Amino acid sequence: MIFITGGTGLVGSHVLLKLSQQSRGFKALRRESSSLDICKRIFSYYNADELFVKINWIEGDINDIASLESGMQDCDLLLHCAGVVSFSKSQTEVLRKVNIEGTANVMNIALNLGIRKVGFVSSIAAL
């Protein structure tokens, strides 16, 4: 089973599209407040609306340890696509909370659960 974070974003939505075209099971973490609009538009753009229902959405957050532990159960592959990109100094705390603390949470829980295969999406903004 594959666990993916950031599935409601641009890159994560494309990853979910590819996963939905395969037979392997997967779960996607999404925040309660997140919109599925980008993801739905990506599927629609590729004429794959019928595949959207294959997504097993898990409500949670990368800064919510309990939701991560629960969601990652029975997974053997993690695809971490969640993150915030901003060049604004006003976003410094959000960037730290999500991109540093959230990523550490995801990786630590993956290690604790024995998930040994990880794909990690980042950007030049991380530099």
Task: Identify the residue ranges that each predicted region occupies.
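Short loop/turn motifs at secondary-structure junctions
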Residues: 22, 74, 114-117
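Conserved Rossmann-fold NAD(P)-dependent oxidoreductase catalytic core, especially the SDR/UDP-sugar
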Residues: 92, 101-127
